[in-house]
Curated annotation (Swiss-Prot):
GO molecular function ontology, one term from the record: cyanate hydratase activity
Listed GO biological process terms: cyanate metabolic process
Membrane in keyword set: no
Protein family (similarity comment): Belongs to the cyanase family.
Record keywords, A-Z: Lyase
Phylogenetic placement of the source organism: Eukaryota, Sar, Stramenopiles, Ochrophyta, Bacillariophyta
EC number: 4.2.1.104
Cited function: Catalyzes the reaction of cyanate with bicarbonate to produce ammonia and carbon dioxide.
Protein name: Cyanate hydratase
Disulfide bonds: none
Record CDD domains: HTH_XRE
Coiled coil: none
InterPro entries: Cro/C1-type_HTH, Cyanase, Cyanate_lyase_C, Cyanate_lyase_C_sf, CYNS_N, Lambda_DNA-bd_dom_sf
Family matches, as SMART domains: Cyanate_lyase
Source species of the chain: Phaeodactylum tricornutum (strain CCAP 1055/1)
Length: 193
């Protein structure tokens, strides 16, 4: 069955969890092969529509990155957004729209993605500037982290001082402070009791 999928769709199958054949939790069971097939069909509908991710973001009322995540099976489609996606990409089948709403997304990634030059350079930039960004976040917000759950990401471009096109990536994540773990505040029963 994998041999029938396009190479790009096969790359979407996560390799970090080789024994994971499907995932279920109050949702329709979805095999990873089925998800890869759905992603291929949805991306084909996008290509046929000639819409960009920016166009889709405007139609759906989401960021361009989130629009891409929806199509790549990395975010769950809500019923409200499904109606907008149906209007924007009428070639997406009812079955695929239903599956995008009823299946939980695979938010993992194939380790091979880090070999893709753009992805690797973004990873390199985060690791290169990571310690400095952490120091500034701690200085401005305190001891904690930026959430990647309550998080928005948007990608755009600007023009540099020499007229060159420049990439602008905005990360907008909720600050989550670390807490002092006081026993009296812990509502869970201690495993030591």
């Amino acid at each position: 069955m994998l041999s029938q999928l396009p190479r790009a769709a096969i790359r979407l199958l996560p390799r970090r969890q080789p024994n994971l054949h499907c995932y279920r939790y109050h949702s329709k069971p979805t095999s990873l092969t089925a998800q890869a097939g759905r992603v291929h069909r949805v991306l084909s509908a996008k290509a046929d529509s000639n819409l960009t991710y920016d166009d889709l973001a405007t139609c759906l009322g989401v960021t361009n990155t989130y629009a891409a995540q929806l199509l790549l099976g990395q975010a769950k489609l809500t019923p409200e957004t499904a109606k907008k996606l149906r209007a924007a990409l009428p070639a997406v089948s009812d079955d695929d729209l239903e599956d995008m709403q009823n299946s939980f997304p695979m938010r993992s990634y194939d380790d091979e993605i880090l070999k893709e030059p753009h992805v690797y350079r973004t990873y390199e930039a985060i690791t290169h500037y990571g310690e400095a960004m952490k120091a500034i976040i701690n200085e401005q917000c305190g001891d904690g982290i930026m959430s990647a759950i309550d998080f928005y990401c948007d990608v755009g471009t600007s023009i540099g001082k020499h007229g060159e096109k420049r990439v602008v990536i905005t990360f907008n994540g909720k600050f989550l402070p670390f807490i002092e773990q006081k026993a009296e505040d812990n509502g869970a029963m201690s495993p030591r009791d």
